[in-house]
Amino acid sequence: MQFSRDWSRLAATGNLDSILNGWAEDAVMMPPGLPPLQGKDAIKQYVEAAMKLPGFTISWEPVSVHVARSGDLAYMIERNTTTLKDSTGKQVTTYGKVVTVWRKDSTGTWRNVVDMWNDAPPPS
């Protein structure tokens, strides 16, 4: 779970290359209300556009992780928090529940291969 926390901290830096490094080349992102984004190039376009939104920030925290016996595949349940400014300039915060699938690559680095989320109520 620590690599997901570290990745969340990287997202706060705004360094696009560092952020994109967390996804595998063949990753699939499934944002709410959109068709699946296939591959790192499509994910890059989505992330780049999000980062340009006024006041945009995102962070997430793993809730649980389940690793396959093989040790090279895992899934996480996570919560995210996204903030941006609406058309009037008011700051709006939304919350999401997230399922991510991770695969260990040939260098032993965990990479996100499936990233899917939808809306959640605010934390209590």
Language-model regions: role of each:
Residues 1-21, 28-124:
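A beta-strand edge to alpha-helix "cap/lid" segment located at domain peripheries
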